[in-house]
């Protein structure tokens, strides 16, 4: 019950920090849908047909759609459960700050791949969910929406499938598979973005694409776009480069007894060589092992030995954190914020491309400060855990 006691305070905080993400992969809900009270008072001025469906379609429809990655569709009012069956869970997720899974704090540096649900639209959904979930004008015929199994950024310049199918058998809910994929390039290629086409959309939970012995090309989550780095930056793949693909699988409850076979495909988007001739490199700063003390703020640091332009950051977390801040500290003592996160959970790792890259000199100290969150709070329950690390995407000087 302590989680519910904090919902009101979190709701106020969400609205004051201005925006909340709309890329809703995941209302991964701990509770199941319950029956709807037909006699519940309809106090909301907003209805599903007029106000709520367009918001859910445009902001959550990549995942919460029939055949999509999420275990339920929110794009019907009551068909097969529909949004009305999940209204209470939607409310809980929004008030807890647990969903949508986007954690960039707008008081920090702006990030490129941001999809926001503005406070007004957030308020509409919460008001509808708590105000009797009215259906609205029944003469409005809503369009049928199905999952689009295609490339969000258009057909890639090169598609590289997994070398062999991977099977997750019955009664196996989670698994991981790591493979190498040769590019067979006869010359160097410059890559501006990388995407993934999941073989089984309902099961491919996340993926990491990197160059063997080189930079991280993509941190992929369902519903994400393939976003270009800022200021024309790009990755360089040498002739004969080999890619490493790691895919994490997580079945929904509907598929627990099924044997599912995945053959995901990497998509590469090429570009011209940047004017600088410099390629994005990956630098990692490892945190302490063992997990945080729930009552004590955590901090660690590393050094950017070679100067460069920071174009992106990739936090990997070992626990939920109420706040995460990455700061560059120059030899003079001057501090520059690189990234701020709020209510961040480890099961949603992301790459945050900066809107405005930040130039740092050699031997800049990188400080990371974290305020622990409650690993068991809220509708999501206990979080997954990964090794604590902050990845930096750097274009060398």
Predicted regions located by residue number:
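N-terminal secretory signal peptides that target proteins for export/translocation
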Residues: 1-12
